[in-house]
A protein has these predicted regions:
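Glycine-rich phosphate/diphosphate-binding loops and the adjacent beta-loop-alpha structural elements
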Residues: 269-275, 350, 355
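Alpha-helix C-capping/helix-to-loop hinge sites
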Residues: 40-43, 246, 270-273, 336
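A glycine-/small-polar-enriched, mobile loop at the entrance of the PLP active site in fold-type I
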Residues: 15-53
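Alpha-helical metal-binding/catalytic segments enriched in His/Glu/Asp
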Residues: 37, 216, 352
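Conserved PLP-enzyme active-site core in the AAT-like
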Residues: 2-24, 28, 55-271, 290-294, ...
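Conserved C-terminal alpha-helix-loop-beta "cap" of PLP-dependent enzymes
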Residues: 5, 294-368
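Conserved PLP-dependent catalytic core of the aminotransferase class-I/II
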Residues: 61, 271-305
Length: 385
C-alpha cells in the first residue's frame, strides 16, 4: 500500500480545475515520469555528464541546436539574462564588476511588464522600457531601434498569442526579431505557459529567437520545479558556463538529477502525444457539461477558446445568474468533498479547465455545481441551509 503523505501531514488534496498554475502544483506527472525520477534517485552520477546528455537529447526532441534544464522558467529568465550580459562583455558573469553589470542594458516592452520579470530585474542591469501597454500609440520598429546602443545586452520578449492576459501595444515577435538581428542582439522569449501547442518548442526559436524559456511543470507535465531553455548553440555556450552547477549565479538554481531525468521523460512523452485526441476529449467534456445544465435557469456553461493564458486549448466557465457570487462559489467548491480549486472568470463566473482534469474529476465538479445551485435556490427561498 502506497504512503499517503498529504493525509499524514493533514494537507487536503484538491481537484485542480484552474489549470497549470504554480500555486496549485502545476500539473500531474505521468507514472512513466515518476518512475524515471525514482530510477534517477537510486544511483549517483557525475552531474555535468548527465546534464550534457540530457540537454543533448532535449535539443534533439525539440528540434533545437541546444537545450538546458533549469529549476523553473523564472530561473531560466535570470540565467538567460546573466548569460547575455556575460556574452556582451565576453567574460564569465561572476568575473564582472557590479559597475559593469549595472551599465549593461536589457530592453523590455512596457506591455510585457509582469511579476515574473523579477528574474530579469534582480540581475541589476539597467531595464530600458519601450512603448506603452495599450494601442493608443502602438510600438513601432523605430522605438526599438532608438533603444539599442553599445550597452544593450539583450531584448526580452513575453510571448502570448492573442486572447491571453498580456497587454496590447508591443511589437510583434517577428518585428522584434528582425530589428534585433540587424544589431546582433540576442532575444530571450518567455514562453513559460505556451505549450500547447508542442510546436512552440521549436517554432519560436525557428523564427529567430536566441533563447526560449518554458516551464517544465505546466503542460509539459514534468517536475514542478523544472524549466526548459532551448535555442541557439552560440548563446547556450554561455548558458552552460553561467548556469548550474557552475559557481556564481548558476549555483543558486540547483537542478537535481531527478528533475533532469524527469523533465526529459516528460518531454519525450509530450512530443509523442496525440494532441488531436486530447483536444477532442476536452471538447466532448465541455459539450457534455453544457448539456447537463441546459435546463437550468441559474447556471450556464460557456466554452472559452483560447483559454486565459492564450493557449489553443478549450476550457469552460460556469456562469451563475447571481451577480457577485463568484467568490462564494469558489469557497463552496473548496469546502466541498472533494475539495475543488479554481479561479473566478468574472464576478459571477468560475473557470473549469479540462487541461488538468480527469473524467472522474469533471464528473465530480458537475455534481458539486448542481449542489451549489441547490444551495443558492434554497437561500433564494429563504430556507435555512
Amino acid at each position: 500500500m502506497s504512503r499517503d503523505i498529504y493525509r499524514e501531514l493533514g494537507v487536503r488534496k484538491v481537484i485542480n480545475a484552474a489549470g497549470t498554475y504554480t500555486m496549485v502544483g502545476g500539473s500531474r506527472m505521468s507514472e512513466e515520469t515518476l518512475e524515471a525520477m525514482a530510477a534517477a534517485a537510486r544511483s549517483q552520477v557525475v552531474i555535468k555528464e548527465l546534464q550534457a546528455k540530457v540537454n543533448e537529447r532535449l535539443a534533439s526532441l525539440t528540434r533545437n541546436e541546444a537545450a538546458f534544464v533549469t529549476n523553473g522558467a523564472a530561473a531560466g529568465l535570470h540565467i538567460a539574462g546573466a548569460s547575455c550580459i556575460a556574452r556582451h562583455y565576453g567574460r564569465p558573469f561572476p568575473s564582472l564588476s557590479p559597475e559593469q553589470i549595472a551599465r549593461s542594458e536589457i530592453i523590455l516592452h512596457r506591455a510585457h511588464r509582469n511579476p515574473y520579470d523579477w528574474g530579469v530585474r534582480l540581475l541589476n542591469a539597467r531595464i530600458v522600457e519601450i512603448g506603452f501597454p495599450n494601442m493608443i500609440l502602438p510600438t513601432v520598429e523605430d522605438d526599438l531601434e532608438y533603444a539599442i546602443n553599445e550597452n544593450t545586452a539583450a531584448i526580452f520578449y513575453f510571448f502570448m498569442p492573442p486572447g491571453g492576459w498580456v497587454a496590447q501595444g508591443a511589437l510583434s515577435l517577428e518585428n522584434t526579431l528582425r530589428v534585433a538581428a540587424r544589431h546582433g542582439i540576442p532575444v530571450v522569449v518567455d514562453a513559460a505557459a505556451q505549450v500547447p501547442p508542442a510546436e512552440n518548442l521549436w517554432k519560436i526559436t525557428g523564427a529567430g529567437a536566441d533563447i526560449c524559456v518554458f516551464s517544465g511543470g505546466k503542460d509539459l507535465r514534468g517536475p514542478q520545479a523544472s524549466g526548459l531553455m532551448v535555442g541557439k548553440k552560440e548563446i547556450f555556450e554561455w548558458i552552460v558556463r553561467t548556469g548550474f552547477p557552475t559557481y556564481g549565479v548558476g549555483r543558486m538554481f540547483k537542478v537535481g538529477r531527478e528533475e533532469m531525468v524527469g523533465l526529459l521523460a516528460a518531454v519525450e512523452q509530450y512530443v509523442a502525444m496525440d494532441s488531436e485526441t486530447r483536444m477532442s476529449w476536452a471538447e466532448e467534456r465541455i459539450a457534455s457539461a453544457r448539456k447537463e445544465f441546459e435546463g437550468s435557469s441559474m447556471i450556464s456553461v460557456q466554452r472559452i477558446y483560447p483559454n486565459e493564458a492564450g493557449q489553443p486549448f478549450p476550457q469552460m466557465t460556469f456562469r451563475f445568474d447571481r451577480p457577485g457570487c463568484a467568490e462564494e462559489v469558489l469557497r463552496l467548491l473548496r469546502e466541498g468533498d472533494p475539495s475543488i480549486f479554481t479561479m473566478a472568470a468574472d464576478e459571477q463566473s468560475v473557470f473549469v479547465n479540462p487541461m488538468t482534469l480527469r473524467d472522474e474529476e469533471i464528473d465530480a465538479i458537475i455534481v458539486r455545481m448542481k449542489e451549489i445551485e441547490h444551495i443558492f435556490r434554497e437561500k433564494g427561498e429563504g430556507k435555512d441551509v
